């Protein structure tokens, strides 16, 4: 850990301490090391090194060098200036400033933060102090944690004493080394706090001075305002941490009386109510408990002396803040009075205890009059987070708080540990006050009652109410502490509750309800509070009757009374204003403020109990004596304040927390009736229900709703509360399945007054969100209101199940009967999803969404993750994501259905105003700043917000609509990607990229593994980059820019001195992750989450190196970083016993666990690595870089050489062939047997995976099962036993689908890896420089590696076998079988050759076996055919050639050749007709490639069979069993018969002409033949081979060879008149050459057939020549040059023949040469036939003899 810099070491220590604080103890050894390294830092606290003139001067001296630790640094002028600036800014030693700046530069803070170096130094300085103090605080917290192991707690206690307080462990103490330093810690801590306050004051003074100069326009605004704001916030946090440490020191008994007195003296001089004062209140409470309470360490005498010091009064007790002094005295007296309640006071002789008691009572009451409770209440309230504070609670506080100014409104939230410690001490204060001062509390109540009676119109003291509110703050959110009020009914606290609830005044009742609400923060406490309010609730054992206590009955009576009162005072209906229903000219002051507050507290208490306690909720809903809902709804339409109406809505919301369907329908009925006719059932109305009227007209239900919405839309409280009520009503009831197959309201809702559904409510929410939020001035209220609206929108979106539409059309389930809604059409029409989506295309709504997201970065930086600001941004982003996901469903399925229904039913709903966009993306395109905002928010440290931002960026970056708008337009030059341009402004892209780099490089917590925030953020970043690159890999995107590339119009570059050039880009961060990542551990094996991380990074790099846009840049950079060798070093071999997240691959649960996903990712990552190595090897071979090429081959052969060191041994390329294990039968997973689900149609949940084929959507499958189960439940067979069996089958089916999916993915990943491995091996085979024996050894090693697997897969797994056979084929063709003589063979090469011969024969047998089984695809069998052909022609024939040479004509070689050939023929014979049958079938019934390969193999088989003749016997005369077999199979007859269509097949246009190809062709064949012509050539070659044997010629002629040729018309057509298809682009000269080539092949077949059988077929040969005399004569003339020049005619025809092909002069010459060669070959073939048949002699005998002419010319 010594290589960590100071801040990074503190951060590492902090992370380990946080883990222990969370009871995770995996890193204790690391923690111990880190803790030991910080010992000196703990002892120094945050003391700053003093300024030193020598150090300052040393920075300016030449040479400018500085030594820090053991390192010496050379300094430039800019660095020195930054050092001096930092030292001046922080009043810090110059050398320490240099150390901080060096750390900043080393850690890349300038790039990460996009700030000047000195500002980064300021931030690092404060971070170091903050982390140091936080670590000290955490150590003290752990030492006080009683929930951890006692031994561990003791160890941390010893560490705290030693390293923080300077007290050595007991075993190290001696008399000379007594803990004297402990006496200095508290003063040092106080001094440090004073220093923090001084720094902050200095900053404030500078800011004020600068503001004055700015106002006078003398200076410009600061550029480093964000840094200053961070410094201020950090200083406040440091002060808070110091206060917490000081608090722990006091609690651990390290304080003295002198320390306490000094502390009180400091408080007496404190003149401002601010954050720093609140930080000290827990310390004050700890001091009081320590020295003034019987629970502390002080004795009574000591406490009495301190009592005189604190409560002495007079001028000596003057306080700059009198209310603070009053609070100190009150707190002290409450605690100190505990000394006088037990027997110890009997030792105080001569003291009048009663007089002292009266004096303390008087002092306490005087303190209250001076504002003690007021101050404590302010501290308790201000310490709580204000952002979520309910306005009602704030109103109660403002009503009681009168003497304390408000806390400065600065963004300095109090930490959770300060809040906790303060509330714990407030709990102690409350307990002490109730237990030690009961008479004082009674006196307070008596005095307040007397004041209310004697002076009802004057302001009364409300200290008792303040005390109750203090209790509420102290216990709010702490249900375990609140149980002390409920556990023991005879306790002081329980007695206080009963006493406070009796005969309470209106203000006291309000405060009591608020206190009771805060004492009900969980179900147990809330139920206890509910029982307390029941008339029959438990009471203290006989001490007090509850007859006059606060009960539910009293609360209900009060509500009924005020409802009647408020509604009876409502003006007459004709005078009511239609604009404000029920409140025409109303003044909220018509209800007394105290009464309104009491009603608010009643309602808040009801809402709390209903929320927390199901018993209370049921009682409130089902109470037969009091209809709560009816009463409060009547109250809501009266003349009441907005805040009271909001409380009513919160009660209704609470009643629906754990609602049932029936309760939900009833609530909707109440709300709908109340909205459409609010005054119909109010008390006081006589006869029929009345409606308000306007200008003599009675408004209808819709007008009433509009008026109510206008009323609720004003202000924050009631609109926010009403929207939250609507949201709760839309949340599905608990206990429902996850189908969301019903609308969240009664389907009949609105049927009598408007269109069905809740469209008016949706419109109201969006109206508030888009329009009325502009009227909210308070930022906190605006955020909360927006969040409430967005929560409503989100619920409407997520509760719509789009899959039901698909399942309804594709599955065999009767979905209308199965789903909860009436039918699918009703569900689609009524669900609020359609209306919400319609609103989301509104311009104002999208603008409000963008405004919600776009916030001040400074405010965001200081906001907590659960603040309204952060949560509202998060929800807005989530809404946008959901809208993009569901947009297609809405546009193509839902909206057409809604419009169709409206057209059929004649219903027309109110259109959405300003629905300007046809797609949601159009709104995003109008706000490009959104991309920048989303990128910036990724660096705030809020994990959920970061994940959402990255997800939305991914959606935006992959949207085809947005991509088409952002991408360059080919019609306009210079139009770059708009998003890239936006990110380039002000360097925003570099800032975002740096923040993403920091997130990528953040350390992972091994204990949290995949659940850690850092890990999830890393994956989100990688997924975003991958999706963006994959969408447009060949165009510059924002992903390229963020990775560090310089994006131009259509290409990428590297900016000089930019992040990429300096290797500080996000791309290099990804590289660093891969290079440093270790995915395996000795004990746990492969860590799945790390494997996944590695694969996600690799696939991004894979896209980059494959894309032409970025390939060259990326390949060069990867080569420069030795990426290839790092990957091979980190690669782990796959072993059967290697665990994957604790699971073995052979385990039965492997495919059901997430370990299988890690295994799949590992295979994919290795495939990517092999792909890269193959690409790199090709690159270095083509670019001729032999040194790197040699290094790569060494690495692939198992050795990496590093400089002059010994080579590192790693697995070789053949060792990495470890992923193929034939024992794993993943593809043979049997299907389970089902009884009830056997006919289930899973077609709708089948997805076509890009690589894995059929893939099941598990979520859709679960939905299908849920629908099927509901279908069963509706039937009569749905017994419990039946449903249990169905549920069991469902579980089995889901598991089987999961296993099937993962097995397919695994097999696909394995196949992809095999392809990559095979491709890499082929590249190695092609590019290696091996010669002779090393080459043979390498090829043998490769052959040995693949043969066992190929043998296992040859007939079972065609895809895997194809890849291996491909390698085997290349290996076979690469083997050099030509040997000049045995004398040139050394012993080693001879041995290798023998081994290869054995392996090749094994390969040959394997292929024969697979062929005979007709295994695999035609492509695979064509490979088998090629391998067999190569073996026969190269191995067997070559051996025969070697044996025939004189130098090798010894007995040994001849015998081996005979054995080899015999062994080969024996193997062929072993498979018999079965083998030949498959080959013959493929020769005619497969694709062209396989046909050709089969024909070629048959040719080789015939040739090999012929070559086995005995010595001295002509091969033509030997019987060939292969030929007999072919004849038995009727193959020869079919072969000959196929010649009838040979001319059409040969001339069929199968490809276009490419002149460039001719340059690579041989002169004899300038144009490559098409696959069909290749097949025809192979077929003719086989015929020729057959006809060269007497046996074969017989079978061919018997098959009517001449008749087939006659019918084909090949020899009957004049080659010069053959038509050429102009569309084929083949020049005529080329077409002629091809035609003549066909004639040559057929003529040779005829000649061989005639000559092979001697005189038997002469007649047929003569007849053939006679029939085609014209062609024969024409060819012979052509060949002799008679009748015109061949070249000239051909050139003219090729130029003027209408061909569209363009040929160069060289191409023309080559084509003419080929044509002439074909003509010459055809002439030779005819002459051979003429000679063999004696055709000329025969002809001469048939005509009369003539006198010979002179100069007779003979044609040859």
Curated annotation (Swiss-Prot):
Cellular compartments per GO CC: nuclear pore inner ring
Keywords: mRNA transport, Nuclear pore complex, Nucleus, Protein transport, Translocation, Transport
Main subcellular location of this protein, as a coarse class: nucleus
Domain of life: Eukaryota
InterPro entries: Nup186/Nup192/Nup205
GO biological-process terms attached to the record: mRNA transport; nuclear pore organization; protein transport
Pfam families hit by this protein: Nup192 (PF11894)
GO function term, MF aspect, one: structural constituent of nuclear pore
Subcellular location: Nucleus, Nuclear pore complex
Functional description taken from the UniProt entry: Functions as a component of the nuclear pore complex (NPC). NPC components, collectively referred to as nucleoporins (NUPs), can play the role of both NPC structural components and of docking or interaction partners for transiently associated nuclear transport factors. NUP192 is located to the NPC core at the nuclear membrane and is essential for de novo assembly of NPCs.
Assembly description: Component of the nuclear pore complex (NPC). NPC constitutes the exclusive means of nucleocytoplasmic transport. NPCs allow the passive diffusion of ions and small molecules and the active, nuclear transport receptor-mediated bidirectional transport of macromolecules such as proteins, RNAs, ribonucleoparticles (RNPs), and ribosomal subunits across the nuclear envelope. Due to its 8-fold rotational symmetry, all subunits are present with 8 copies or multiples thereof. Part of a tetrameric NUP192-NUP170-NIC96-NUP53 module.
Family recorded in the similarity comment: Belongs to the NUP186/NUP192/NUP205 family.
Protein name: Nucleoporin NUP192
């Amino acid at each position: 850990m010594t290589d960590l810099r100071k801040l990074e070491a503190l951060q590492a220590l902090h992370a380990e301490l946080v883990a222990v604080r969370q009871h995770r103890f995996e890193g204790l050894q690391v923690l111990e090391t880190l803790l030991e390294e910080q010992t000196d830092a703990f002892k120094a606290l945050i003391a700053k090194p003093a300024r030193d003139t020598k150090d300052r001067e040393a920075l300016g001296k030449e040479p400018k060098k500085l030594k820090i630790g053991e390192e010496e640094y050379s300094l430039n002028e800019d660095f020195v200036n930054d050092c001096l600036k930092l030292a001046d800014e922080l009043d810090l030693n110059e050398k320490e400033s240099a150390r901080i700046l060096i750390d900043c530069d080393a850690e890349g803070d300038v790039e990460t933060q996009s700030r000047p170096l000195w500002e980064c130094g300021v931030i690092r300085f404060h971070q170091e102090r903050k982390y140091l103090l936080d670590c000290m605080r955490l150590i003290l917290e752990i030492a006080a944690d009683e929930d951890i192991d006692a031994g561990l707690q003791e160890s941390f206690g010893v560490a705290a004493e030693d390293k923080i307080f300077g007290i050595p462990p007991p075993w190290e103490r001696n008399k000379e080394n007594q803990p004297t330093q402990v006496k200095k810690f508290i003063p040092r801590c106080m001094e440090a706090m004073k220093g923090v306050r001084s720094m902050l004051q200095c900053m404030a003074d500078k800011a004020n001075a600068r503001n004055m100069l700015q106002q006078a326009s003398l200076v410009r605004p600061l550029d480093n305002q964000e840094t200053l704001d961070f410094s201020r916030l950090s200083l406040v946090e440091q002060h808070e941490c110091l206060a917490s440490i000081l608090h722990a020191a006091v609690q651990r008994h390290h304080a003295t009386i002198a320390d306490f007195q000094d502390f009180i003296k400091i408080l007496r001089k404190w003149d401002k109510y601010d954050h720093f004062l609140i930080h000290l209140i827990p310390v004050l409470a700890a001091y009081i408990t320590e020295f003034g309470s019987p629970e502390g360490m002080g004795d009574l005498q000591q406490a009495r002396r301190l009592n005189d010091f604190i409560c002495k009064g007079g001028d000596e007790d003057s306080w700059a803040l009198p209310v603070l002094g009053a609070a100190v005295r009150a707190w002290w007296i409450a605690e100190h009075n505990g000394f006088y309640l037990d027997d110890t006071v009997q030792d105080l002789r001569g003291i009048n205890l009663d007089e002292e008691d009266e004096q303390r009572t008087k002092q306490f009451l005087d303190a209250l009059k001076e504002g003690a409770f007021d101050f404590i209440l302010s501290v308790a309230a201000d310490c709580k987070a204000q952002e979520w504070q309910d306005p009602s609670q704030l109103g109660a506080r403002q009503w009681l708080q009168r003497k304390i100014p408000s806390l400065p409104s600065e963004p300095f939230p109090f930490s959770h540990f300060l809040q906790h410690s303060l509330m714990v001490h407030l709990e102690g204060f409350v307990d002490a006050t109730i237990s030690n001062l009961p008479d004082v509390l009674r006196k307070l109540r008596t005095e307040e009652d007397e004041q209310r009676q004697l002076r009802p119109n004057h302001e009364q003291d409300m200290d008792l109410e303040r005390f109750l509110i203090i209790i509420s703050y102290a216990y709010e959110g702490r249900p375990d502490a609140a149980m002390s009020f409920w556990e023991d009914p005879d306790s002081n606290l329980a007695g206080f509750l009963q006493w406070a609830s009796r005969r309470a005044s209106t203000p006291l009742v309000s405060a009591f309800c608020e206190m009771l609400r805060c004492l009900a923060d969980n179900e147990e406490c809330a139920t206890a509070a509910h029982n307390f309010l029941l008339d029959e609730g438990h009471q203290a054992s006989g001490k007090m009757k509850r007859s006059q206590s606060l009960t539910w009955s009293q609360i209900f009576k009060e509500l009924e009374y005020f409802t009647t009162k408020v509604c009876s005072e409502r003006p007459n209906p004709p005078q009511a204003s239609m604009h404000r229903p029920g409140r025409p000219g109303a003044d909220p002051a018509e209800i007394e403020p105290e009464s309104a507050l009491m009603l608010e507290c009643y309602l808040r208490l009801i809402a709390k109990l209903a929320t927390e306690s199901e018993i209370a909720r049921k009682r409130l809903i089902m109470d037969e004596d009091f209809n709560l809902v009816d009463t409060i709804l009547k109250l809501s339409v009266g003349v009441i304040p907005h805040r009271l109406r909001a409380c009513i809505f919160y009660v209704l919301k609470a009643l629906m927390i754990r609602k049932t369907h029936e309760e939900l329908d009833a609530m909707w009925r109440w709300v709908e009736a109340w909205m459409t006719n609010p005054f119909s059932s109010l008390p006081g109305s006589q006869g029929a229900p009345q409606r308000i009227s306007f200008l003599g007209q009675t408004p209808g239900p819709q007008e009433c709703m509009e008026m109510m919405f206008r009323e609720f839309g004003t202000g924050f409280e009631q609109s926010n509360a009403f929207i939250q009520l609507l949201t709760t009503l839309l949340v599905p009831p608990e206990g429902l399945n996850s189908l969301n197959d019903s609308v969240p309201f009664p389907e009949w809702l609105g049927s009598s007054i408007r269109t069905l559904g809740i469209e008016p409510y949706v419109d109201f929410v969006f109206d508030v969100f888009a329009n009325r939020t502009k009227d909210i001035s308070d930022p906190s209220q605006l955020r909360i209101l927006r969040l409430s609206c967005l929560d409503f929108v989100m619920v409407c979106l997520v509760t719509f199940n789009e899959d039901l539409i698909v399942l309804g059309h594709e599955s065999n389930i009767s979905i209308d009967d199965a789903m909860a809604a009436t039918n699918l059409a009703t569900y689609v029409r009524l669900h609020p999803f359609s209306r919400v989506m319609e609103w989301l295309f509104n311009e104002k709504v999208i603008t409000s969404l963008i405004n919600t997201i776009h916030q001040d970065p400074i405010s965001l930086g200081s906001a907590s993750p659960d603040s309204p600001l952060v949560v509202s941004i998060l929800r807005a982003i989530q809404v946008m994501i959901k809208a993009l996901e569901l947009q297609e469903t809405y546009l193509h399925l839902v909206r057409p259905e809604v419009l169709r229904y409206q057209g059929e039913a004649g219903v027309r709903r109110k259109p959405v105003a300003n629905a300007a966009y046809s797609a949601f993306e159009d709104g995003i395109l109008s706000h490009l700043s959104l991309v920048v905002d989303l990128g910036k928010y990724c660096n705030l440290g809020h994990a959920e917000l970061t994940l959402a931002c990255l997800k939305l960026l991914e959606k935006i970056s992959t949207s085809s609509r947005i991509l088409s708008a952002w991408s360059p337009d080919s019609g306009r030059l210079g139009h770059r990607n708009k998003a890239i341009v936006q990110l380039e402004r002000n360097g925003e892209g570099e800032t975002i990229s740096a923040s993403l780099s920091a997130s990528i490089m953040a350390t992972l917590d091994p204990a949290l593994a995949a659940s850690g925030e850092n890990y999830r953020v890393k994956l989100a970043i990688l997924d975003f980059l991958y999706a963006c690159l994959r969408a447009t890999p060949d165009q510059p995107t924002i992903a390229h820019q963020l990775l560090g590339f310089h994006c131009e119009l259509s290409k990428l570059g590297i900016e000089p001195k930019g992040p990429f050039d300096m290797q500080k880009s996000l791309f290099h961060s990804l590289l660093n992750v891969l290079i440093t990542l270790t995915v395996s551990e000795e004990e746990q094996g492969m860590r799945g989450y790390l494997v996944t991380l590695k694969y996600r990074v690799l696939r991004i790099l894979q896209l980059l190196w494959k894309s032409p846009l970025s390939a060259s840049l990326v390949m060069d950079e990867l080569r420069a970083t030795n990426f290839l060798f790092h990957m091979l070093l980190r690669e782990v071999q796959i072993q059967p016993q290697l665990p994957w997240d604790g699971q073995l691959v052979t385990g039965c649960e492997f495919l059901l666990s997430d370990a299988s996903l890690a295994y799949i990712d590992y295979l994919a990552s290795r495939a990517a690595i092999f792909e890269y190595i193959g690409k790199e090897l090709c690159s270095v071979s083509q670019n001729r870089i032999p040194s790197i090429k040699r290094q790569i081959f060494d690495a692939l052969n198992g050795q990496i050489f590093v400089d002059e060191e010994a080579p590192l041994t790693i697995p070789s390329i053949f060792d990495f062939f470890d992923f193929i294990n034939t024992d794993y039968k993943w593809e043979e997973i049997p299907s389970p047997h089902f009884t009830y689900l056997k006919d289930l149609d899973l077609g709708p949940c089948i997805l076509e995976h890009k690589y894995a084929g059929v893939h099941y959507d598990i979520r859709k499958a679960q939905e299908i099962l849920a629908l099927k189960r509901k279908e069963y439940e509706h039937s009569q067979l749905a017994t419990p036993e039946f449903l249990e069996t169905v549920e069991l089958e469902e579980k089995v089916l889901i598991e089987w689908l999961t296993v099937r999916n993962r097995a397919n993915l695994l097999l696909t990943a394995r196949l992809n890896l095999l392809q990559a491995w095979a491709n890499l091996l082929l590249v190695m085979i092609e590019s290696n420089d091996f010669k002779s024996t090393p080459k043979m050894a390498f090829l043998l090693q490769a052959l040995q590696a693949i043969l066992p697997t190929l043998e296992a897969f040859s007939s079972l797994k065609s895809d895997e076998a194809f890849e291996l056979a491909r390698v085997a084929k290349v290996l076979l063709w690469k083997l050099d079988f030509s040997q000049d003589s045995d004398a040139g063979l050394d012993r080693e090469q001879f041995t290798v050759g023998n081994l290869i011969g054995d392996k090749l024969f094994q390969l040959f047998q394997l292929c024969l076996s697979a062929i005979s089984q007709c295994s695999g695809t035609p492509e695979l069998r064509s490979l088998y055919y090629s391998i067999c052909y190569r073996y026969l022609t190269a191995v067997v024939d070559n051996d025969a050639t070697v044996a025939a040479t004189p130098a090798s004509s010894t007995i040994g070689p001849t015998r081996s050749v005979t054995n080899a050939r015999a062994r080969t023929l024996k193997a062929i014979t072993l498979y018999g007709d079965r083998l030949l049958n498959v080959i013959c079938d493929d020769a005619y019934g497969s694709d062209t490639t396989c046909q050709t390969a089969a024909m070629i193999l048959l040719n080789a088989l015939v040739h090999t069979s012929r070559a086995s003749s005995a010595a001295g016997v002509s091969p033509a005369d030997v019987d060939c069993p292969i030929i007999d077999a072919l004849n038995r199979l009727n193959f020869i007859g079919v072969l000959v018969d196929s010649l009838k269509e040979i001319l059409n097949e040969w001339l069929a246009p199968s490809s276009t002409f490419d002149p460039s190809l001719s340059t690579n062709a041989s002169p004899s064949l300038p144009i490559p033949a098409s696959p069909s012509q290749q097949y025809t050539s192979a077929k003719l070659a086989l015929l020729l081979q057959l006809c060269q044997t007497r046996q074969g010629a017989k079978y061919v002629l018997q098959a009517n060879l001449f008749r087939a040729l006659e019918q084909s018309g090949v020899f009957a057509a004049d080659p010069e008149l053959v038509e050429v298809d102009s569309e084929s682009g083949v020049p005529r000269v080329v077409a002629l050459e091809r035609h003549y080539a066909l004639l040559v092949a057929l003529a040779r077949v005829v000649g061989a057939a005639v000559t092979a059988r001697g005189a038997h077929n002469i007649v047929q040969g003569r007849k053939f020549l006679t029939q085609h005399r014209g062609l024969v004569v024409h060819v012979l003339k052509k060949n002799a040059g008679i009748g015109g020049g061949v070249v000239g005619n051909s050139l003219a025809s090729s130029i003027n023949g209408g061909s569209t092909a363009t040929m160069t002069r060289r191409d023309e010459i080559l084509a003419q040469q080929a044509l002439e060669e074909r003509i010459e070959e055809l002439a030779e073939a005819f002459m051979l036939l003429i000679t063999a048949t004696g055709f000329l002699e025969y002809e001469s005998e048939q005509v009369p003899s003539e006198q010979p002419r002179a100069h007779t010319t003979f044609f040859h």
